[in-house]
Amino acid sequence: MKSFSFLTLSLILAGALHAQATKPAAKAPAKDDPIQLEQVDVTADKENNFSLPLDAVATSGSRLGLTSRELPASVSIVTQEMMQLRGLRTAVEAVESAVGMTGGTNFGSIPNYSTRGFGGNNVTIMRDGIRQNTASQSSRTVDSFILDRIEILKGPDGLMFGEGAIGGAVNYISKSPSPTLRSDLLASYGGWGSYRVGLGVGGPLKGTGFNYRADYAHNYTNGYQDRNSQRYDALALSVGWRANEKLSLTWFGTFLDDWNESYYGSPTIYDAVINTTVAGAVPEVRTFVATTDRMINPRVDPAARRTNYNILDNYAATENVFNRLRTDLRLTPEIELRNEAYVATQLLKWRNEESNTWNPVAKNITRGALTLIYRDDVLLGDRLDLTIKQPIAGHANRLLIGAVFERNDQIRGGAPGNVTLTIPSVTLLNPNVGYGPAAPFKKTSRIGVETHAFHLQDVFDVTSNFRAVLGLRYDHISLQRDTLFNNTTATPTPFSTFKKGYRTTTGRIGGVWILSKTVNAYASLSRASEPVTQLVSLTTTSADFSLQKGQQYEAGLKGSFLQNKLDATFAVFDLEKRDILTSTLDPVTGLRISQQIGAQKSKGAELALALSPGDGWRIELNGAYTDSKFADFNENLGTSVISRTGKRPSNVPEWVANAFVAKRFANGFSVSGGPRYVSDRFGNNNNSVVADGYVTVDASASYTWSRWQVSLRGRNLLDEDYEPVAGTTMRRLADPISAELSLRTSF
């Protein structure tokens, strides 16, 4: 019913607005027919035609209106046109097309990104520059149809987003109100009962001074795995009003509703294990221990490839609502004031059995306990910026002074105690998974996080060929955690309160050398910080630890060549995360203690090329190399401490590469496609579990008639069996080869 209500609401609203906006269209003279040139296939600007839109404003890298070419940092931009051309259905698929990015959807529909040696919560996920929470706490699968573009900034970005973002930031950008009439329609059907519908309309409301945009997307699949159906509904609205030449107001609203049955992965079966920490260890037939062991002959049984071991009544359901009001006031030609007030809410309920591991002795699957998760979050915030464009000593200068206030109130809940399953183990094939035990959601804690931040950014033209780009941000973070119920026991614990405060200063300093009209070189130093664990999980046991620090040196080149037919970016980086927790022995007591003396380092290079040689051809290539390792890290195993120094962090590939080629023919036909390569990754800090590298190939053939385009697309054409995100005792495998038929139009 929710899906129906979303669709009904969007159709009624969009239809009413579009009817109002199109009333005068019938009177338009025939000479206005060239408006057909707005079709994306025909007239998309160069910045939209490439995955390297160097002259597009990169809002994730600066609030001073700098383009990607002008910014001393690496920013990839995936436009809506790119998503449509490549058939990128979700934000995760879109992000993976960017240079050096890997991604996947974890259980419960949680996106997981990795770049430059860092992943998980080290990569912040934003919506219009606003982070609702850490990625694992609030991020959901988002249909790409409702987005204007996605921006991916590499490396620490505390300047823009505050706490977090040591590895990078992924920013979902909403569509703005449309000043011209435009409608978009998308429909597709593919394997396993998958279908997708998108409807968008926008334009001016004549005589009112208002512009609007409304987009609705419905995405459903039964899933390749048994009992893995997923539904995603998204409605995005925006309304803009220009009161006069100086004042404008714009409201953005996004409403997300999803429900899915979770597939946690296929159990990794093995013949025996070897303890890698013991010299000369012999194989043992026992349960695998991820911190010390290596499996002998690990594999997924093909007969169990589609089996879902989760309980029959599992589900993960969320509702997310984002509202943002932006006010732009031009005080003088040189001074502009911008304010953004926002509120974001999340309601999540989660009922799953999350652990299914192989028992080589009993030759069956050992199951975990019932996991119940409840989240009820409200984020309130306001961001105020003052921009001054005023020369200094005859040199152009842009200065921004800003302040941010946020209050994030979060309620967390789970099962009342350790709720065991009535069926503790099942067979590998044809398992009788049964239903989970009846257990209510119990509120366990209430967390409040308040942030006050001040920041400044400046762009100063030192000479006609050199520009200094500077930024500084100060954050004061206050945390209060009220424990309401201890869910590790059925006996309630007394009410307790924990408080913690942090102060941190981050920023970026860089320089841009203008080598020619189309080629820039740059270098920069950027910093960010984050707690040892996400703030929502912070407890008294981690109260004494300070924020972890991230620092990156980067240099690169951005330019257009061959009479602007070739766009290219190249970057080298050296990124370090310091003060990570590591275990040592107290020299006095001999006890194992945790200290912030560890480090994780990565260095590498990234190259991206986009070539438009003419005659309907389009060629794009990108690749990244990353050398990532723990520089000083001892892991506490409970009974011992073992060094992980020199080991590669989990889920970090050395090589990632993409290629995409498109050819448009004069008769309306077009073809496109290309391969993607990701090298081996490790599933644990011990580097004893390997997720094999893989190559996937997607391709499509399309026919365009008038405003309509029909496409037949093949996905994973090599039928590669692979893990998008490396696992250990369970492997969450991607879908095999599939086909999809789609229809889209714009008018």
For the regions a protein language model found, what residue spans apply to each?
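Outer-membrane beta-barrel translocator/receptor signature
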Residues: 145-148, 159-235, 243-247, 321, ...
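Acidic/polar loop-and-plug regions of large Gram-negative outer-membrane beta-barrel proteins
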Residues: 219, 223, 238-242, 246-328, ...
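Gram-negative outer-membrane beta-barrel transporters
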Residues: 464, 574-576, 595-685, 718-721, ...
